[in-house]
Each structure stands twice: as structure tokens, then as C-alpha cells.
Amino acid sequence: MRERAVGSKGSFPIGIAELQEVSCASVEINQPLLLADLRSDGMLRMRIPTDAARAASHELGKQWSRALWLHDEKPDGIIYDSRLNGEANTALFDRALPKLNVKSSGPLLDFRDEVAQILDDFSLEIV
């Protein structure tokens, strides 16, 4: 959706049908996670190209994600700065599942408070 909104003015319309296809879960961590930290100078220290975490295309990111998954330290996932708003994002690998507990899950639109905040924060409009 990020790239579709480039250059638009005012609220950006998103179809309700698209949102109805998305599921969401609230998850709690029940054991410490080992994350490869790609924030700040982490990518530079690990010799990972900037585009692995910041390009619009995800191809290079997928390759580096696989390389990190295969690493001997067996990280549970990665933490990186969002290219959209600079906030920290976490992507977890399958091996992290035993360290998590799903508190609730369901269609995205069932999480009304969270969806309302996202719509407001990013000037989105459901059509």
C-alpha cells in the first residue's frame, strides 16, 4: 500500500475488500528472543546492504533474511527501522514460535481500535 499512495493528496482510499482479506493477532513473548539488530549501525557492522531493509522491493531483504536464519547463532528474527516511519519493526522466524503466546487472533477489522488508529495516523479512508 505504501507505494500506491506515493504522490496522492488528502486521504488515501483503501477498499474494504482488501482489508477483509487480512488477519491479525495479538501476541505476547513468553521467553527472551534473540534478534539480529539491523537498527542504527547494525547493518553496517554486519556488512548488510542498506537496500536489504529499506528498498521498496523485498527481494534483497528476503535473501539476507534467509542468510540470517541460517546463521550459526540461530536468531529468532530481526529488528529493523521501518522505512515508512522510522519505528522499530520485528520480523520473527519460525523457530521463535515456541517463545510466543497468541492472546487473540482474527480478521483485521475485528481489531477496531487499532485499525482506527492506523487509519488516522496514515490518513487512510476505507471505501
UniProtKB/Swiss-Prot annotation:
InterPro entries according to UniProt: RES_dom
Lipoprotein found in the keyword field: no
Function in brief: Probable toxic component of a type II toxin-antitoxin (TA) system. It is not known which gene encodes its antitoxin.
Protein name: Probable toxin y4kH
Domain of life, per lineage: Bacteria
Gene source species: Sinorhizobium fredii (strain NBRC 101917 / NGR234)
Keywords from the named record: NAD, Nucleotidyltransferase, Plasmid, Toxin-antitoxin system, Transferase
Family according to the record: Belongs to the MbcT/ParT/Res family.
Enzyme class: transferase
Organism lineage string: Bacteria, Pseudomonadati, Pseudomonadota, Alphaproteobacteria, Hyphomicrobiales
EC number: 2.4.2.-
Gene Ontology molecular function: any one: nucleotidyltransferase activity
Classification via Pfam families: RES
